[in-house]
Amino acid sequence: MDKYLMDEAIKEALNGIENGHGGPFGAVVVRDGKIIGRGHNRVIINQDPTCHGEVEAIRDACRNIGSFSLEGADIYTTSEPCPMCLGAVLWAGISNIYYGCDRDDAQRIGFRDKVFYDTMDKLSYRLIPTQREQCLDLFSRYQTMPDRKPY
């Protein structure tokens, strides 16, 4: 863990809250000791519930290095990632997550992260399979493409 890198994530969060962009969430993506991506919560300014600090930092890092893979990178974030951000971190191939506040801290100031974690196992009633055969045809078509890039 590097204090300087966490301080940079905190600066990102401050930038966001001081400019009215969203909540107190900032993040930096780091590879080989160098910051390759920065982001802060932009939910309010973009009117987009997916613009969390971690997701914004991942998007920035991917643009900066020209790849959707962030393998070998770490992320420093001001709060424990919500399930959506955790999914993005895993999809990006990020190795380690260093965070400041946890889900209980976020809940205390009005954010619902803990609720999402607590209800993940109860979502089966909302996951309703439909038209699987047609979707499997799409998968087969994609799988036979010579220029496909698995990720």
Located regions from the model:
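Short beta->alpha transition motifs characteristic of CBS
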Residues: 36-43
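Helix-adjacent hinge/juxtasegments
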Residues: 47-88
